[in-house]
Amino acid sequence: MSTQNNQSIRSSCDRCRSHKLKCTVAPENTRSGSSRCTRCIRAQVTCVFGHRSQSKRSTNVKKADLRSGTNGQETTSMQASTIVPGSPDLWVGRQEVEEGLHIGSDSGPSMADGDLWAELGTNHDLSLFDITPSSLPTHNSQQQFSATDFCSAPMAPHSALSTINSQEWQLDLSEYPNQTTTGPHAIVQLSALVAKIHETSRTLEESFWTSLAESNQLKSYPIGRVLSLSQDFSTILECIWASKNMDCKQSLSCAASDNHGQDATSSFELEDVLDYGELLSTVGTSPGRSDFSTSTHSSVATTVDMPTMLLVLSCYTSLTKLYSLVFEHFESHLSHLPHSYTSQTAHASPKWGLGLQLGELPSADETCTKVYTAVQILLDAFQSVEDVVGLPRSLSAVRQQSCGKEEEGESGDVFNRASLWTDFLAKSVFKATVKSSSEEDCEEIRQLSIKVKSLKSLIRERMKL
C-alpha cells in the first residue's frame, strides 16, 4: 500500500475511488499507521483501502505520458467495446480507462489540490458529491445501467451487418427450381454418348455381322442398341433446348426492362453495321428462305455455348456413321438372299380361287419384312434426332428425300425464323470431314441418305413391290 500524501485514483480508498477522486493521506496518520485520508476523516467514516495493485509507473512518468482528450476518448471507446454489457467487470473497466484522462489546466483548479478539499466542510462533503444510484457499483449493477452508459461501446461490425443484412443475403431458391435437381452437365452427357456411339460402331465393325452367311444370324442383330442411342440423344437435346430457352426468355425480359424508357435514337440499327444480304451470300444461303429442316429449336441454338454445340454436331456425325454401318450390313445381307419365294407365288397364282382370303396368302420372305420394319423404326428415330438438332435440310439424311417445292412454299415463313448461326457452324464442321472432290458441301454426310435409298430399293426389289 502506498504511503505517499497524494494518492492516485487507482490507489485511493474505496470511498474516494467510487467518487472518482484522488485522496490525500494525512502525514500524521501515515506515521501512526492508521492510513486514513482527509475526506474520510472529515466525513467521520471508515477509510478502507481495497486490494489494488499499485501502478508500476512513477508519478513523473504519469505526468509526462498524459494523453490529450481526443486520444483518451478513443481509448475509452476501444476498451469499453471489449467489455460485455452487464458484466461485473464493467465498473472496474470504466474506472481503469478513466484513470488516463486528466483535466486541463484551463478548466479550473486541479482535483488533487489539497487546498480545495481543505476549504470544504464536513456538512458540504456528501451533498456536493451526491450521485445517482445507477452509477454506483452495487450487487445488482447489471439491471441498473442505462442505455447511455454504453454509448461509447459501438456494436461490432459483424453483428451489425448480420442484423441488418440477414434477409438481404438469403437466396430465393424458388427462382432456380432445377439447380439442385438436375443431373450431370450437358457436356458430360454428350461426351458419354459420343463414347457409347463409337463403342457400338467398333463392336459392329469387328463382329460376325459384317459377313453373314446365313439368314438366321441376322435375327440377333442389336438394333436396340442403335435405337437406344438415338432416343438418348433426342432426350439430352430436349433438356438442353428447354433450359436454354428458359434462360433466353429471362435474358430477353431483363433486357427489355433495362431498355424501357430509353430514347429510341440511342439504339443502333443492324443495317448500319452489317449488310444481312451480304452475310447470307457468304454462307451460300439465299435471303428468301433458310435451309433449315425445322425451326422447333433452331431459334434457341444461338444461346448454346460453343463446346456444347460442337458436341451436339459430333454426336450427330457419329450417329450418322453408325446408321450407315447398320444399313450397309442390311444391304449386304439382302443382296445375297435367294429368290425362292418368287417362283412359289408365281406357280401358286392359278390355284387361287374366288374364296381366297388374305390370311391364306403365303408370306413373303420373313427376313425382308423384318429388315424393312427395322429400317422404318430406325429412320423414325433418326428423323426425331434431326428435328431436335435443327440441322439444315441439305444436311438431313431423311427429310431431304421428301423435300418438295410445295412444302417449301407452305413453310417458308417458318424457315425464315431459323438460325443462321447453326447453319454456318454445321457446314463449317461438316466440311472438315469431306474427303471427296465434289463441289457439293458435306458429300460424306449424305452417304447415309444414299444408303437409305439403296436399301429401300433393294427391299422393294426382293419383295416385288
Swiss-Prot record:
DNA-binding region as annotated in the record: 13-47
Biased composition (Polar residues): 68-84
PROSITE patterns: ZN2_CY6_FUNGAL_2 (PS50048)
Record's keyword terms, sorted: DNA-binding, Metal-binding, Nucleus, Transcription, Transcription regulation, Zinc
Any one GO molecular function term: DNA binding
Function: Transcription activator that specifically regulates the expression of the gene cluster that mediates the biosynthesis of fusarisetin A.
InterPro entries hit by this protein: Carb_Metab_Trans_Reg (IPR050797), Zn2-C6_fun-type_DNA-bd_sf (IPR036864), Zn2Cys6_DnaBD (IPR001138)
Species of the source: Fusarium sp. (strain FN080326)
Taxonomic superkingdom: Eukaryota
GO cellular component, as recorded: nucleus
Compartment(s) of residence: Nucleus
Phenotype on disruption: Impairs the transcription of the fusarisetin A biosynthesis cluster and abolishes fusarisetin A production.
SMART domains: GAL4
Region (Disordered): 58-88
Name of the protein in its database record: Fusarisetin A cluster transcription factor fsa5
